[in-house]
Amino acid sequence: MAIIMTESSYERRVKALYEKQIHMEALEAKFIKKVFKFNSNLLDVKEAASRHQRKVGKLQKVLMERREELDKRVSFIEELDRELEATKLHNLAMKDWFKQQKMLAKQRKNEIMESIHTLSKTTRTYINQEALPARVKGVTVLRGDKRDQLIPFDLKATDVEGLDSLCQHLESLNVDVAQWQQLISLAMDMAMESRAPTTPPKEADNCKSIIEIDLTSPMSHT
């Protein structure tokens, strides 16, 4: 005769508690797994955020350096523009100055040429411009009753004694020596100016013109 055993209410409760515990442990394990995964993902996110922050920091540094470089370039360009404008103004001023000097030089040349022409007619003396400024070469014409007398001369510009003797000879022939000397001086001045460089050297400021020599002062031949 088989014995039929039925579960008591106590056993059912124990079994239910056991199954519940197993279920809770499974849920706990599943929860722990999710928490671990969440923490792992959170760590990855933090590391990614940290890397992003470092990249942002590097970009900000690069941007700051570029901005500083750009500011320097802008300052340089502004300074260059100021210098360029100053140079333009200076060049305009120099252009006006050279134009004025050229005009004055032309005016002076015309005045000298007019004076040379007048003195040449007054003293009846004709100067060989090609020989100047190295030599004083030309001819003085003396009017005569029957015919004119020619007095040629050809001397070194530095031959002060020879020029002095020539002046004395011309004076003895009633030639206005003062005007004759002025003619020679102006012709010499014209020759030196026409042969001078466009931009004379700085030392030229200290040079004296040959016309400053007193042609009447006695000096020995060199």
UniProtKB/Swiss-Prot annotation:
Keyword check for Cell cycle: yes
Highest taxon listed in the record's lineage: Eukaryota
Knockout-associated phenotype: Die as late third-instar larvae. Mitotic neuroblasts in larval brains exhibit high levels of aneuploidy: chromosome alignment is compromised during spindle formation, many chromosomes display persistent mono-orientation which leads to aneuploidy during anaphase. Chromosome behavior is also disrupted during both meiotic divisions in spermatocytes: the entire chromosome complement often moves to only one spindle pole.
Residues forming coiled coils: 51-86
Keywords on record: Cell cycle, Cell division, Centromere, Chromosome, Coiled coil, Kinetochore, Meiosis, Mitosis, Nucleus
Cell division as UniProt keyword: yes
GO biological process, one term: cell division
Subcellular location: Nucleus; Chromosome, Centromere, Kinetochore
Listed GO CC annotations: kinetochore; Ndc80 complex; nucleus
Known function: Acts as a component of the essential kinetochore-associated Ndc80 complex, which is required for chromosome segregation and spindle checkpoint activity during meiosis and mitosis. Required for kinetochore integrity and the organization of stable microtubule binding sites in the outer plate of the kinetochore. Participates in SAC signaling that responds specifically to disruptions in spindle microtubule dynamics. The NDC80 complex synergistically enhances the affinity of the SKA1 complex for microtubules and may allow the NDC80 complex to track depolymerizing microtubules.
Subunit and interaction comment: Component of the Ndc80 complex, which is composed of Ndc80, Nuf2 and Spc25.
Record-stated family: Belongs to the SPC25 family.
Protein name: Kinetochore protein Spc25
Source species of the chain: Drosophila melanogaster (Fruit fly)
Name of the encoding gene: Spc25
